[in-house]
Amino acid sequence: MRKARWVRLIVLFLGGYGLNLHCSLAGQTLSPTHIDDFTGRPRVIVISDIGNEPDDQMSFVRLLLYSNEFDIEGMIAATSTWQKTATHPETMHALIQAYGQVRANLLLHAKGWPSADDLSALVFTGQPAYGLAATGADRMSPGAEAILRAGDREDSRPLWICIWGGANTLAEALLHLRLTRQPDAVEKFVEKLRVYSISDQDDAGWWIRREFPQLFYIVEPSTQVGDEYYYATWTGISGDVFYRNGAGADTKTVTNQWLDENVRNQGALGKMYPRFAFIMEGDTPSFLGLIDNGLDSYRRPDWGGWGGRYIYRQPHGESRSIWTQGGDLSSRITSQDTVTGTDGKQYTSDQATIWRWREAFQNDFAARMSWTVRDYAHANHNPELEVNGQPGTAPIVIEAEVGKPVLLDAGRSHDPDGQKLSYHWFQYIEAGAADANHAVVTITGSDGPIATATPTAACRPRWLPAPAPCVGTGTAHLILAVTDDGSPQLTSYRRIILNVHAASSPENH
């Protein structure tokens, strides 16, 4: 009798759970179908509360080292909850002057480095006051004007706004836009923008998201005083010890000792890289994913890459869906990655979506810093990949069928320094739209230049029975990581997306 009663209770529980899960998924805004597909370098504007503590200056040094990867259209000194009444564009100018001393050496290694004069001309200031109170119809800072000029340019590429401090300069620009232009012109302007904000560091971010619901916005909403930063994905850059949220992560490349040995002792720009007070470079994830390394996560935040992985959902307290964290663990619709840690155990967290790549992006940083003082022959450079006859870094999309092997050939990849290459093919299980079916793939030859990927199912099984059955089509994101044996070891990537269809019936053959 007791056993029968418990069985009925379990059935009722699961039935109610399934109903709740169904309602939860039905009410969730589906991920946007748009994928940013453009040629050329990403357009970037940075808004920074530089001067309040070391980490903005650290991130700014890295930004300059990768300035050949972007079209920088503005660097705006702003306020934040940590610096409410002053901005410090002079710090940006000082760092750019140091960059100018090493630019000639950087040009020995790659093309596209802007001149120091050109960069200095792109430094602006926002209002030297805090938050929304500093905006209004009669106010227009040079920083807000720079945002409007950039957004008005005839350019099909999206414009990334990387917010390292308060968001009131962007709010100022958008308010002016609304007050001076027709609604269709405002909509056209806003559609160009891609915002990645390092939490909410003033009261402007929530206002922007509410007033401009069509605006692309990456953020984990937070209070303005920093008590919720520990939860944010961006802390995966280096916050393991300070925030106590990085179990499994390897901390050796984000210590002051490692930075002394690999960054601060490397020429004029390295000397400008301060010791961190709390964590290293908390703002860097906002542009780290824009680097053209083959992961291409800037095309869709749910693809995942050096800047983390996010899903499209409506967090509690927000007026609409944004690119953010969280999700439904029971159905595996979540922003978290499961990664093997340094101890061989598996760890699941939002921060892991960044720290899983840490050794690679820190080695990349160290190599670039060495470019500021070494000639080409005495420095290391990234492997150049070719997969199935396709060179470059753009993602490769392949139509596949369950049970039919897909050949992946990277044998023509090479290293510009003639070094030995090691290969690692793997399925990035969590990558892709949260509301899509994720296919299951088996990879053979995963540690060589030629691998075979065989889809075994169009849909990954869920932990609980899915309220909507698999319709026979799913996607799988495969990553090729190729690492050289130089010093430091450098890694390049290629993303292969398999559109997996159910096996054809015999009568169709």
Regions found by a protein language model. Name each.
Residues 426-465:
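Surface-exposed, flexible coil segments in extracellular/virion-facing regions
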Residues 499-507:
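Extracellular interdomain linker/stem segments of modular secreted and single-pass surface proteins
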Residues 492-498:
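Edge beta-strands of extracellular beta-sandwich domains
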Residues 472-478:
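Exposed beta-strand face motif in extracellular beta-rich ectodomains
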Residues 482-489:
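Short, solvent-exposed loop/turn segments at the edges of extracellular beta-sandwich modules
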Residues 8-24:
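Bacterial N-terminal signal peptides
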Residues 1-6:
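N-terminal secretory signal peptides that target proteins for export/translocation
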